Amino acid sequence: MLRLELHRENLMRRTIVGFAILIIICAGVRSVRAGDKIDVPKVITKSDVEKIVGAPVKDPKGRNKNGTDGYYESEWSYRSIEGNAGIYFDVLYAGQGAPAHLTRTMFSMLPADKSKSTPVDGLGDKAIFCPNETGMAMLHVLKGDILITIGFHGQAPKTVLDSEKSLATKILASL
């Protein structure tokens, strides 16, 4: 009888300890996933942009936003102090509450102004370069459920693709 009670106590203790460990692991995974979201200015610095633009730029303006529909977006821009050069970034994560294949559907509808696009190899799952979309040279990269958009204004579209690819590579490496 005593042996049965000790066995029950041990079983109960092991169950509680196992459950506590499971909760700790789940909480850790959740915090890693929540902390994994990109903050563009921490990855692409003002100094990085100044090297590409070739001139001093203003501090970044933008936001990081958790959407109510299960998405996260880091949307930032850097503008030159003089002239009209600037670089725009938008990194969109489709969250668990987002419609299935949201970012893939969005990517398939690009470029937004229906101008000509060129596929770009070696970036994410798919990438396209849109040299004249909305007055900017835009690079769109799809990686899983993440859509990255980089827009460059103020220089000839032919000259910015390599810079945009370099910036996209840096963002992809931080995901």
Where are these regions (language model features)?
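Short, solvent-exposed recognition patches
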Residues: 51-130
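Hydrophobic alpha-helical segments, especially transmembrane helices
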Residues: 14-15, 31, 122
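Bacterial Sec-dependent signal peptides at the C-terminal "C-region" and cleavage site
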Residues: 26-35
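Bacterial N-terminal signal peptides that target proteins for export
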Residues: 4-19
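Bacterial N-terminal signal peptides
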Residues: 18-27
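A short, solvent-exposed beta-edge/loop patch
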Residues: 34-36, 41, 46, 50, ...
